[in-house]
């Protein structure tokens, strides 16, 4: 039996090792125990420091003993710090290994499931099925085109004649609109001789002024 086996009570060829989850839990428990030990030592160090300051020069022997205990506690604390770092590293490595194991296990399970799903599949049958689907889609499209195509029912007209008639109607409508824009046709008036009319006799300015004065006098004496 190995030294590690003697320490942890394990050994023998038939002994089964702990599972990753069990080992991780053990490491966490150990971390918790060492953390509590750290807190205890930190308190003891503070107490011994207070004791050393308390005695000081009054009782050098007691002060020196307190400082010695403080040094021992500090040494133990440093050892625990190193042990905790090692345990944390081991736990993280074990957790990563356990995660990788679970991932690979699930990937293998998925691969088996995919293989089982493909066991009853034949690539040739898949190709035939896809070809059948394409043929049926093409047939459905042809049927839809045939249904949507208008049927004559005796209305077989010459497209050229219909277009010519339509153009004639459009031209008539265009001519009508042009006539409405131009307005009614103007009728020429008969010629009138260009004779000069006699001008109205113009009174002289003095005569007009005399007439105005007479009218004003008549109005004033009336």
From Swiss-Prot:
InterPro entries: Snf7_fam. The keyword Mitochondrion does not apply. It is found in: Cytoplasm, Cytosol; Late endosome membrane; Midbody. One of its GO terms (biological process) is protein transport. Keywords: Coiled coil, Cytoplasm, Endosome, Membrane, Protein transport, Transport. Residues 21-182 form a coiled coil. Residues 1-21, 183-222 are annotated as: Disordered. Belongs to the SNF7 family. Probable core component of the endosomal sorting required for transport complex III (ESCRT-III) which is involved in multivesicular bodies (MVBs) formation and sorting of endosomal cargo proteins into MVBs. MVBs contain intraluminal vesicles (ILVs) that are generated by invagination and scission from the limiting membrane of the endosome and mostly are delivered to lysosomes enabling degradation of membrane proteins, such as stimulated growth factor receptors, lysosomal enzymes and lipids. This is Charged multivesicular body protein 4b. The gene is chmp4b.
């Amino acid at each position: 039996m190995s030294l590690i086996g003697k320490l942890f009570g394990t050994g023998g060829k038939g002994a089964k090792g702990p599972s990753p989850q069990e080992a991780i839990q053990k490491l966490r428990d150990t971390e918790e125990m060492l953390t509590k030990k750290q807190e205890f030592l930190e308190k003891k160090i503070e107490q011994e420091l207070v004791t050393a300051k308390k005695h000081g020069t009054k009782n050098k022997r007691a002060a020196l003993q307190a400082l010695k205990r403080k040094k021992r506690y500090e040494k133990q604390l440093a050892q625990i710090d190193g042990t905790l770092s090692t345990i944390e590293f081991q736990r993280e490595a074990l957790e990563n290994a356990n995660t990788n194991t679970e991932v690979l296990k699930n990937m293998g399970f998925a691969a088996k499931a995919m293989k089982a799903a493909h066991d009853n599949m034949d690539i040739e049958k898949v190709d035939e099925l896809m070809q059948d689907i394409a043929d049926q889609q093409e047939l459905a499209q042809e049927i839809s085109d045939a249904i949507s195509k208008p049927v004559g029912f005796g209305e077989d007209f010459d497209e050229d004649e219909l277009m010519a008639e339509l153009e004639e109607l459009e031209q008539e409508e265009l001519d009508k609109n042009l006539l409405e824009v131009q307005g009614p046709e103007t009728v020429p008036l008969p010629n009138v001789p260009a004779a000069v009319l006699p001008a109205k006799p113009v009174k002289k300015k003095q005569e007009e002024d005399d007439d105005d004065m007479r009218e004003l006098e008549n109005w004033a004496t009336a």
